[in-house]
Amino acid sequence: MHWAPERDWGREAVLKTYDREPRKTETAPFTEEDRRTVMENLEQNVLATARANPQVTFYYFIPPYSISWWDSELMAKGEFERQMEGYRLMARMLLECKNIRLFAFDDQFDITCNLDHYMDVIHYSEDTGDQLLEWMAAGEHMLTDDTVDFYFDRITDFYANYDYDSIYE
């Protein structure tokens, strides 16, 4: 089921939403300025609220962006390493707050690599959203201090080595 039935869904619909650009040869580093920006934004917009409300449990999640997003937004633009370092920093900071629960789904490769779940590079189907909520309710795919590095190592390896040309075959 799709939350936007008037829209086209699936591989062909996703591929129509962007023109694939050649990959940049240089990759953008995660700079100290990037680090400060992430830290300041998280502190101001998330962590301060969580700390001020210790009686509330906050739920956040990293959505399962499609393989086409990884290709068009990170790989082609040379932003992959920078994004992964930013994600890691964000996750570690969020996990410092004991009243924050962080879930992550970019390791659900059966979702991210199946463009039938998407209408563009980021918007997934209602069924996918329902599945994410079921997992969250069951406490599945929650990052912890013990799992965060394994999670990011796993997705970094997968997306860094994916055959992105196969999307277009």
Task: Name each model-derived stretch.
Residues 50-76, 104-106:
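Active-site segments of SGNH/GDSL-like serine hydrolases
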